[in-house]
Amino acid sequence: MRTITLGSSSLEVPAVAVGCMRINSLDKTEAERFVRTAMEEGANFFDHADIYGGGACEEIFADAVQMNPTVREQMILQSKCGIRQGMFDFSKEHILASVDGILSRLKTDYLDVLLLHRPDALVEPEEVAEAFDQLERSGKVRHFGVSNQNPMQIQLLQKSVKQPIVANQLQLSITNATMISSGINVNMENASAVNRDGSVLDFCRLHDITIQPWSPFQYGFFEGVFLGSDKFPELNQKIDELAEKYSVTNTTIAIAWLLRHPANMQPIIGTMNTERLKDCIKATHITLTRQEWYEVYRAAGNILP
């Protein structure tokens, strides 16, 4: 498995991460087999959130690996907090309580990475800074990041937060590539030129923040998977051509497209199918040519000026 450095930290992580949002769909034996396979393949970075399965996903994961200090040393654990029923909450009290709950469910005494899940309109950076400082001093969290945040929101946090923001988890796929399209279509009068995220892609590259694409196979907001969809015939034809050329599956090509971008992204793979996970891992050893990358981009309906 190819590795990358997470943001500006010294943490070396796999080029793809395992998303655990759906691990509660597996029984204990299936969960054990899935996590064991991931570890054997070098995919030892696991992404969680306190809301996944109402907390059950973290508990199921810990039981599946029979969490103990030896097992814990072999993996990198990331979780997220800040989403509550009907609201978002970045208060110091909620962040600290959330981390304690996460650690209890995961049966560990520290997280490698904590992300703030979705922007809180009522965020007070000073409060977040106090929470981060306390978590760092106590050893409960080693690195910090965000999810679904634009450059100004990150800079607002950094006004008070002294720890580096090492990751930003963002929705990104071949068919959900507005952050790429707006950069390509600068100074053009078309829908693709509309900048909806404050140039977050370039911002993250400038500030050594690793982008973690979530839902890398989805189109729209959980409308469906583009692979094999009759809504994207040209895209699937092109992906299938490349899959045949590289002797891999279409799943591998979809992830290879993200990894070809020089931003050094770390896609979050949400599948609970071990074979599909292996296909995603194979993408770390494939480098699409520049021409192939653009062919896939255009086949998805994205335009060039």
Predicted regions and their residues:
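A structural motif
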Residues: 43, 108-111, 141, 165
